[in-house]
């Protein structure tokens, strides 16, 4: 991230923002001049082709929000040799002592197990908590990653393609659950129909610029074609 210029919240409704910011990674500037405001309570979908800067923007937003944001990364970042339960539990490692975490690794805490079991059931993972993550399907692993983010119990959900490995019907249900459990959501997606159906603001990115920023109810899938047009 390079020369990130942030905007201090000016009103109670202001959550985060960038004012003529330069954002990038590995000495590569992705956004040379980004201005963006995000308000509390918004449901925002980031759309655009691969490589246009969605992940860069989410990383900058995560840095700005700190422990307000629950993070669900694109690559899941799960520990393959640990169980689904332990991967979900990792969402709240910082809430427990090192000793408690070590004991839980050997013998799951009863209260944590019950809470995570209830969460897993809502995500269709019941019966899979003891299974190693590397023995789960791609869609199941993605739901474990979502469960870990939900278990963090933070007001803002930040997701990088959190439903990319599930079918549209499952994706819709997962997005409903994510929206129900968080006051604010900012999610990168590639499924435009899901974005229009489950988010109230669409931000379209291309070549380091915001080229669409509009209420979802004012847009159709065809309006988003410009985001995916060949160079």
Residue spans of the language-model regions?
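Conserved ABC ATPase signature
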Residues: 132-136, 140
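Catalytic Walker B motif of ABC-type/P-loop ATPase nucleotide-binding domains
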Residues: 157-160
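Hydrophobic anchor residue at the start of the ABC signature
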Residues: 146
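H-loop/switch region of ABC-family ATPase nucleotide-binding domains
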Residues: 189-190
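Conserved beta-strand-loop-alpha-helix hinge in the C-terminal portion
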Residues: 209-231
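Conserved ABC ATPase "signature" region
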Residues: 102-128
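Q-loop/switch helix immediately C-terminal to the Walker
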Residues: 82-103
């Amino acid at each position: 991230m390079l020369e990130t210029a942030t905007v201090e919240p000016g009103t109670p409704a202001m959550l985060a923002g960038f004012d003529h910011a330069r954002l990038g990674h590995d000495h590569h500037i992705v956004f040379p001049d980004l201005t963006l405001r995000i308000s509390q309570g918004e449901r925002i979908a980031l759309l655009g082709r691969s490589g246009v800067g969605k992940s860069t923007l989410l990383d900058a937003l995560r840095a700005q929000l700190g422990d307000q944001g629950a993070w669900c990364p694109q690559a899941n970042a799960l520990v393959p040799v640990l169980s689904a339960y332990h991967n979900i539990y990792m969402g709240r490692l910082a809430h427990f002592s090192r000793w408690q975490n070590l004991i839980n690794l050997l013998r799951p805490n009863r209260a944590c197990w019950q809470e995570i079991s209830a969460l897993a059931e809502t995500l269709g993972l019941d019966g899979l908590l003891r299974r190693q993550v590397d023995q789960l399907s791609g869609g199941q692993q993605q739901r474990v990653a979502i469960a870990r983010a939900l278990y963090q119990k933070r007001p803002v959900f930040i997701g990088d393609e959190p439903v990319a490995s599930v079918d549209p019907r499952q994706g819709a249900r997962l997005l409903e659950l994510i929206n129900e459990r968080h006051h604010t959501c900012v999610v990168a997606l590639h499924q435009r129909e899901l974005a229009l159906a489950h988010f109230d603001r669409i931000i379209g990115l291309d070549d380091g610029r915001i080229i669409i920023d509009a209420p979802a109810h004012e847009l159709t899938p065809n309006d988003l074609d410009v985001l995916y047009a060949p160079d």
